[in-house]
Design a protein with these regions (language model features):
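Beta-strand-rich N-terminal accessory domains
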Residues: 1-63, 210-230, 273-288
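Asparagine-centered strand-capping/turn motif at beta-strand->loop junctions
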Residues: 29, 137-144, 285
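Short, hydrophobic/aromatic beta-strand segments
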Residues: 38-40, 145-152
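Beta-strand-rich interaction surfaces with strong enrichment in secreted/lumenal proteins
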Residues: 58, 124-126, 266-271
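Glycine-rich active-site loops that engage anionic ligands at enzyme catalytic sites
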Residues: 69, 216-257
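Extended, loop-rich substrate-binding clefts of extracytoplasmic carbohydrate-active enzymes
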Residues: 80-130
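Active-site/ligand-binding surface loops and adjacent short beta/alpha elements
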Residues: 145-149, 157-232
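Short, structured beta-strand/loop micro-motifs enriched in basic residues and often containing a Trp
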Residues: 255-265
Length: 288
């Protein structure tokens, strides 16, 4: 590894973290969950939000950043929410620095005790840091006897100045499942060109490959989320009404919004033997 560009060190809670510096930006990725917790371009506020109350402990989920939801999304009886990948100890298997200073890291999800049903899958996560943050989650059915169903999602928490001054575009005309309190999972259509967040919001947008832009009037910034290999977009803000663990201060809802890219619910994937699927997300920003 280049000592100047990539450093594997001890982070919060004593957890191993990879710190990255490029000519344009800096980033941090914890091996616990292969969890991106920081991405900041020079001269800008951070693009990624992490709760001040988040736990940093082995085997515990980090509140904020980019949790990897896999191999399922949401709740499953008797199982951890959003799957086991986000709390597993991933392995850093490759790092590279391009001539221009761009950094690429590759992480592998190891075989885990008690997860033998998933052992025929191979899952890797790549992080490329430059002026843009590019993330890639690849799952291959290397040795399963038959097709296996999975859900995947990069559950990105974005840092905003004031949620009341934020609007999201790119979802007009798209069907979504309303999972907020009182929504009862009803299927609805996004009618407005711009989505505002004035209350608890939990929507799974279906059959969409569109980019989403987050216009932040407070920070005078536009964050663009582009994706490939994804047919679902999730927009989430818990407001003060959704009950969460004590790793999130309800007041923090003012400074974050999740725009998540993946394949969940009706858009879940079926991987036949010998097939693979890659979910890729590119995050960029500009003044606006």
């Amino acid at each position: 590894m280049s000592a100047k560009s990539i450093e594997l060190t001890s982070g919060k809670g004593g957890l191993p973290v990879v710190k990255v510096r490029t000519p344009w930006s800096e980033a941090e990725i914890y091996l616990n969950g292969a969890h991106v917790t920081h991405f900041q371009k020079s001269g800008e506020p951070p693009l990624i939000f992490v709760s001040a109350k988040s736990q940093f402990a082995a085997g515990k989920a980090i509140r904020g950043g980019v949790p990897i939801c896999f191999p399922w999304f949401g709740n499953r009886a008797g199982e951890p929410s959003h799957g086991f990948a986000r709390t597993a100890a991933w392995q850093l298997v490759k790092s590279a620095v391009a001539p221009d200073g761009e950094v690429t890291l590759r992480f592998a999800l190891p075989q885990l005790p008690g997860r033998e049903a998933w052992s025929c899958l191979r899952t890797e996560f790549s992080v490329t840091v430059s002026e843009t943050l590019t993330l890639g989650l690849t799952t291959a059915n290397d040795s399963c006897d038959s097709a296996i169903e999975i859900e995947n999602c990069l559950h990105t928490y974005f840092n905003v100045g004031d949620i009341g001054a934020v609007s999201l575009t790119g979802l007009q005309g798209t069907a979504f499942l309303d999972n907020a309190a009182g929504g009862n999972g009803a299927r609805k259509i996004q009618e407005a060109a711009a989505l505002r967040i004035p209350r608890e919001t939990n929507r799974i947008y279906l059959d969409t490959i569109s980019a989403v832009e987050i216009r932040d009037e407070s920070l005078k910034r536009i964050i663009r989320v582009e994706k490939t290999g994804s047919h679902s977009t999730v927009v989430w803000n818990p407001w003060t009404t959704q009950k969460l663990p004590n790793d999130f201060d309800p007041a923090e809802h003012q400074r974050m919004v999740c725009v998540e890219s993946g394949n969940v619910g009706p858009n879940k994937l079926s991987l036949a033997p010998g097939k693979s699927a890659t979910l890729q997300v590119a995050v960029s920003s500009r003044a606006g």
